[in-house]
Structure formats: C-alpha cells, structure tokens
C-alpha cells in the first residue's frame, strides 16, 4: 500500500491549495473574492492566499494584516515564482516544516509527535485528515474537541474530504471505509493541553470549508 506520509502531504495540499503545482503563485478569482469580502466587512475577513503566499508571509514578513504587507507578499511571490528561484517541491517542503499546527507548534513532524506521538509517515488516514484540518485556524484547535474526542460535526467534514480524496484518486474507496473522526485518539503531549483547556470556554469552532 502507498505510504500514508504521502497521503498526509497530498491531503494538506488539497486542503490549502489544490492547484499549487499548476499556478504561478496567485489565484486571481480567490484574491478578487477576498478583496470584495474584506471591503464589505471593513476588515481582513478572508485570506485568499495560495500556499506560495502563505509561505512568503511566514518566512519573510510579519503577521500584521495590512494592505502594505499584502502587497509586499504578492511582490515576493511574483519574484520567486516568475524567476523560478526555487522549485515547487522545495517550497512545499519548507511550508510543511514551518506551518503552524497549534499554539506554538510548528512543522508537520513536531505536530505529528505533539498530537499522536508518531512521525508523519506513521499517521493513519483519519489522523491525516484531522491534521490537515488544523492549519486554517491552528490556535483554535481546542474548540474542535469534546474532551479528547472530535465534536460530532466532524462527521460531515470527514465525509466530504474522503469523497474528494477518492474522486481525485488519492485513496481507494476501500481505504475510505471505516475512516471516521471517532477513530481519532489524541495520545501525544496535546492530550494534557486539551484536558487543561476544555473547561475554560464553551466556544465552538467548526472545520473550515476546504479549498
């Protein structure tokens, strides 16, 4: 069978930027929709960022949400992508090593150990889907749990993601059978963090729609 480490990487790409290997760093329609929503709400309500833009933001720029920073972000992405300063494969590798997966948890390897006491290549499919779902709102991961189990609304989320993975040939329909959020068991150091924070807030945070 294929290595689940590969499925893990592909699921993250499907979640964050499915067209990463095919675009030049920008998705004009996503940027346009983001700007329209930001103007309507008079705040930075929607990202519209490609994986390339997220990488540049995390490596080169501050996290401040300003128009000037967004323009700087787009300029650096254009320079990197248009001049082919590095490969897409290398960009994705760096992204996996620096992306945030929880409060002060950075990189896929650290995150896998933090939540499951495993290396990324050892994760099962249910764990891969959970890990990919964290990236859009890493600081809100505690709100996804009742105790140490994912909240019931993850059922629909998993169904959508599994259907997408099967449709795109990333997994077989047989591999999707029995993959549910109920099978996700937090066994790493995150167990202590989640236990300590569960009683602090009743806030709910549903998984984001995947790109």
Task: State where each predicted segment sits.
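Membrane-interfacial and juxtamembrane segments of integral membrane proteins
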Residues: 32-34, 70-78
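Membrane-embedded segments
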Residues: 10-40
């Amino acid at each position: 069978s294929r290595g689940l480490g590969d499925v893990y990487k592909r699921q993250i790409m499907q979640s964050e930027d499915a067209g990463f290997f095919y675009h030049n760093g920008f998705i004009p329609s996503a940027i346009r929709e983001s700007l329209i929503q930001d103007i309507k709400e008079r705040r930075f309500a929607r990202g519209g960022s490609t994986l390339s833009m997220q990488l540049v933001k995390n490596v080169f720029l501050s996290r401040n949400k300003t128009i000037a920073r967004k323009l700087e972000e787009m300029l650096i992405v254009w320079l990197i992508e248009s001049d082919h300063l590095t490969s897409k494969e290398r960009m994705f590798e760096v992204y996996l090593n620096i992306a945030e997966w929880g409060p002060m948890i950075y990189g896929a390897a650290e995150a896998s150990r933090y939540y499951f006491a495993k290396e990324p290549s050892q994760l099962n499919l249910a764990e891969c889907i959970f890990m990919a779902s964290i990236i859009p709102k890493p600081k809100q991961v505690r709100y996804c749990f009742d105790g140490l189990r994912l909240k019931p609304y993850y059922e629909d989320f998993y169904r959508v993601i599994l259907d997408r993975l099967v449709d795109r040939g990333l997994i077989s329909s047989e591999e999707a059978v029995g993959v549910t959020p109920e099978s996700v068991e937090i066994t790493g150091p995150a167990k202590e963090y989640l236990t300590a924070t569960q009683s602090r807030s009743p806030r709910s945070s549903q998984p984001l729609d995947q790109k």
